């Protein structure tokens, strides 16, 4: 079973792309704030509407509000919408400039536009918003077809489901994952998912990876390279609080979402303008294996975890976090 970093045979083509340098000239603060509110404000907007309906409106108007929200839960989404594509490009451009986000690719030549890759992105944080640097609408990576696998809860949330679908997100089901890889899409996922958000700690980065091997198995079955990715600074763009305990964990698992109280500037959903550095490691080539054994999956999983840890250690000082610790749980 071969599993090693791959390149095109030449010297590694290290590349640094700054969101501010790429989009700074075409951005202004108002547009950036508007983009961030559209992208990240839907959760707070839904909560505000529900609170308004429950506590302040008469029954008839409350029912109207809930009917309105339900309508947006089931309204069909046109993934090829021209408006959706334009809005997505607007959000991606201004998001990369807002923080700003810098993308550091260790070997750009190692990525073939005609191949599909499995990106294992860490950490989850409150929201894994640094992923926008890898989106196809941003255009930083040389990959024409990219999808982000996200919790299915997103796709039952009014307004959010439309926006995030247009941004390239899709439900994180095994069937979806396999189908997308087979059709030539590169897939970005956060292996730790809901449980990683539950394990978050202030001042330390947590990657819930030890028990997460399903994404490795799928990559092996389809013969797609695994790519470690780490985002520095993402955990600082929101302040947050969450309850603890086994009951809360069971609830989070049941709804496939970790309900966290989080806030940004002036208590709003607008995140703090804290620089983020998204570091993309070299792909780990994996031989196609339709029926990998548990031991074979464990071996490749170990290589991925080791590559992620190494990526973190080599870049943390450069990203401005020399004393930061990454815990694999």
Curated annotation (Swiss-Prot):
Xref: Pfam families: DAGAT (PF03982)
Catalytic reaction(s) noted: an acyl-CoA + a 1,2-diacyl-sn-glycerol = a triacyl-sn-glycerol + CoA
Locations listed in the record: Endoplasmic reticulum membrane; Lipid droplet
EC number: 2.3.1.20
Topology of this chain in the membrane: Multi-pass membrane protein
Tissue: Highly expressed in flowers and seeds. Expressed at low levels in roots, stems, leaves and pods.
One GO MF term: diacylglycerol O-acyltransferase activity
Cross-referenced CDD domains: LPLAT_MGAT-like (cd07987)
Enzyme class: transferase
Inducing or repressing factors: Induced by heat shock, cold stress, insect biting and abscisic acid (ABA). Down-regulated by treatment with jasmonate.
GO biological process, one term: glycerol metabolic process
Transmembrane segments: 37-57, 58-78
Keywords tagged on the record: Acyltransferase, Endoplasmic reticulum, Glycerol metabolism, Lipid biosynthesis, Lipid droplet, Lipid metabolism, Membrane, Transferase, Transmembrane, Transmembrane helix
Predominant localisation class: endoplasmic reticulum
CC terms in the record's Gene Ontology section: endoplasmic reticulum membrane; lipid droplet
Similarity annotation: Belongs to the diacylglycerol acyltransferase family.
General function of this protein: Involved in triacylglycerol (TAG) synthesis. Catalyzes the acylation of the sn-3 hydroxy group of sn-1,2-diacylglycerol using acyl-CoA. Can use oleoyl-CoA and linoleoyl-CoA as substrates. May play a role in TAG biosynthesis in different tissues in responses to environmental and hormonal cues.
Protein name as it appears in the record: Diacylglycerol O-acyltransferase 2D
Organism listed in the record: Glycine max (Soybean)
């Amino acid at each position: 079973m071969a599993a090693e970093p791959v390149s095109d045979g030449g010297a590694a083509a290290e590349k640094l792309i700054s969101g501010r340098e790429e989009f700074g000239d075409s951005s202004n603060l108002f547009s950036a704030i508007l983009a961030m509110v559209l992208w990240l404000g839907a959760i707070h907007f839904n909560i505000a509407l529900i609170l308004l309906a429950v506590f302040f409106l008469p029954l008839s108007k409350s029912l109207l509000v809930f009917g309105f929200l339900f309508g947006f839960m089931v309204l069909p989404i046109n993934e090829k919408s021209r408006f959706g594509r334009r809005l997505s490009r607007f959000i991606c451009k201004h998001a990369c400039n807002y923080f700003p986000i810098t993308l550091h690719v260790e070997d750009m030549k190692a990525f073939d536009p005609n191949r599909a890759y499995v990106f294992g992105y860490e950490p989850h944080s409150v929201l894994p918003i640094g992923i926008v640097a890898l989106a196809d609408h941003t255009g930083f990576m040389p990959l024409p077809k990219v999808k982000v696998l996200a919790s299915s809860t997103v796709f039952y949330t009014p307004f959010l489901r439309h926006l995030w679908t247009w941004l390239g997100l899709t439900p994180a089901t095994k069937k979806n994952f396999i189908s997308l890889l087979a059709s030539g899409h590169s897939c970005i996922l956060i292996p730790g998912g809901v449980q990683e958000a539950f394990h978050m700690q202030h001042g330390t980065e947590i990657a819930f990876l030890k028990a997460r091997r399903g994404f490795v198995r799928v990559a092996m079955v389809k013969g797609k390279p695994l790519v470690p990715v780490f985002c520095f600074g993402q955990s600082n763009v929101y302040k947050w609080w969450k309850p603890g305990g086994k009951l809360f964990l069971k609830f989070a698992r049941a709804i496939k979402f970790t309900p966290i109280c989080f806030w940004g500037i002036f208590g709003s959903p607008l995140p703090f303008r804290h620089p983020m550095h998204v570091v993309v490691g070299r792909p780990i080539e994996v031989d196609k294996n339709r029926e990998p054994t548990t031991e074979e999956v464990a071996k490749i999983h170990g290589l991925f975890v080791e590559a992620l840890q190494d990526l973190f250690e080599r870049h943390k000082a450069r990203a401005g976090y020399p004393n930061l610790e990454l815990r694999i749980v």
